[in-house]
Amino acid sequence: MGRIFLEHLGGLKLFNCAQCHTNLTNRSQLISTRFTGATGRAYLFKRVVNLTFSNIQERVMLTGRHMVRDVMCKNCGAKLGWMYEFATEESQKYKEGRVILEYALITEAEGFPSEAATTSH
């Protein structure tokens, strides 16, 4: 198998895999905290890195029929949530390409300021 390439988005507030602490995303990518997954509270994000994806599945959810992929941590394989590929309801189209991370399966951590933000001119 080769080396696993992992990305890091940086930021002041980070979200990581609860199993292996691999960085997944940051607060600036957060769209909503008003979702529910199999383990309870879940968050919707614009961009999440260091994931692998299952095959597409059709699921009927509270908000309608969706085509989704389960998402797993690229480093340890832990299931973390799902990604919306396609929504049949027009009002749900904003979810397409977005990722749900279940709060019980991730951790929040303090990040660090970017170099550009700390450099004075």
UniProtKB/Swiss-Prot annotation:
Residues 13-110 form the Yippee domain. Keywords: Metal-binding, Zinc. InterPro entries: Yippee, Yippee/Mis18/Cereblon, Yippee_fam. The keyword Phosphoprotein does not apply. Interacts with hemolin. It comes from the Eukaryota. Transmembrane segments: none annotated. The lineage of its organism: Eukaryota, Metazoa, Ecdysozoa, Arthropoda, Hexapoda. Pfam families: Yippee-Mis18 (PF03226). GO terms for cellular component: ubiquitin ligase complex. The keyword Zinc applies. Zn(2+) binds at residues 17, 20, 73, 76. One of its GO terms (biological process) is adult chitin-containing cuticle pigmentation. PROSITE patterns: YIPPEE (PS51792). Belongs to the yippee family. GO terms for molecular function: metal ion binding. It comes from Drosophila melanogaster (Fruit fly). This is Protein yippee.
